[in-house]
Structure formats: structure tokens, C-alpha cells
């Protein structure tokens, strides 16, 4: 459960990310594909090379979902309901991949904003990313 402090920390991070969300989304995917090659299996039709238009486009979608969740932090499940349906009913992505994506997003934030990612903010952002992953997999059951 996200505390009031956690919510403020998450909003602060997304405030710093600002106009870089799409870039960070693509960078997160590239990092995930490189670090966890098994995640590539969900994208057999993608050009997964650095700078790929397909990775950038999907990174934009990932970033938009995270921004949407942060903007509706008191109702993440409502904000991501359609995306949850898509992942549960059509895409059937293994739930562990959301954790891997979250780890990679944390690394990207740390690279670009090292002073922002204090231990407290890191913990809050990790809790938020876990909450997003839980919402995206809630309808699998």
C-alpha cells in the first residue's frame, strides 16, 4: 500500500521525468531486452535494435501507462483497467516480466536523475511499480 509520502515521492519523480518519459520508456525496454533476453519472445515481429522505431513506439506506450498510473495514483486499477484486460486476455505476458520492466525503469531513472533517487524515493518508486504490475496481472486469475 502506498503511503502519502510514497505518493508524493512518485509524483516528484514523474515531475522530474517530464518530457523525457517516451525516451525513458524506450531506454527501459532496450535495457530489459538486453538484460533479460527471454523478454524478447513477446516481440518476435519487432526490430529490437538500438533506436528501433518499434521499440520507441512501444516505449512511448509503456511511458504513457506509467504516467497515467502516476497521475491517478489513488486509483491505479481504474486508470489501467483496459491495459489490464489487454494483458490478461490477449497478450498473456508472464507476470514476472512486469517486475523485470520495473527494475529496468528504476535503473533508467537512477542514470538520468541520480540525486532524485534517494533510498526513500527508490523504495516508493519500487512500491509504485509493484502496484502497477499487480494491477496489470490482477485479471489473470
Swiss-Prot record:
Any one Gene Ontology molecular-function term assigned to this protein's record: haptoglobin binding
Gene Ontology biological-process entries: hydrogen peroxide catabolic process
Name of a matching Pfam family: Globin
Matching Gene3D superfamilies: Globins
Alphabetical UniProt keywords: Heme, Iron, Metal-binding, Oxygen transport, Transport
Cited PROSITE patterns: GLOBIN
Residues given in the record as heme b binding sites: 87
Entry annotated with the keyword Endoplasmic reticulum: no
Binding locations of O2: 58
Tissue-wise expression: Red blood cells.
Keyword Oxidoreductase attached: no
CDD domains in UniProt: Hb-alpha-like
Family: Belongs to the globin family.
Protein's name according to its UniProt entry: Hemoglobin subunit alpha-1
Species assigned in the record: Stercorarius maccormicki (South polar skua)
Amino acid at each position: 500500500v502506498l503511503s502519502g509520502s510514497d505518493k508524493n515521492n512518485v509524483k516528484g519523480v514523474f515531475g522530474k521525468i517530464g518530457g523525457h518519459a517516451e525516451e525513458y520508456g524506450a531506454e527501459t525496454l532496450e535495457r530489459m531486452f538486453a538484460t533479460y533476453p527471454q523478454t524478447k519472445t513477446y516481440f518476435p515481429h519487432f526490430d529490437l535494435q538500438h533506436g528501433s522505431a518499434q521499440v520507441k513506439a512501444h516505449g512511448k506506450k509503456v511511458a504513457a501507462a506509467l504516467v497515467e498510473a502516476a497521475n491517478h495514483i489513488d486509483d491505479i486499477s481504474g486508470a489501467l483497467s483496459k491495459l489490464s484486460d489487454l494483458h490478461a486476455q490477449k497478450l498473456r505476458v508472464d507476470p514476472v516480466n512486469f517486475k523485470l520492466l520495473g527494475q529496468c525503469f528504476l535503473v533508467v531513472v537512477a542514470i538520468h536523475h541520480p540525486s532524485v533517487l534517494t533510498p526513500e524515493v527508490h523504495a516508493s518508486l519500487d512500491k509504485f511499480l509493484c502496484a502497477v504490475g499487480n494491477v496489470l496481472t490482477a485479471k489473470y486469475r
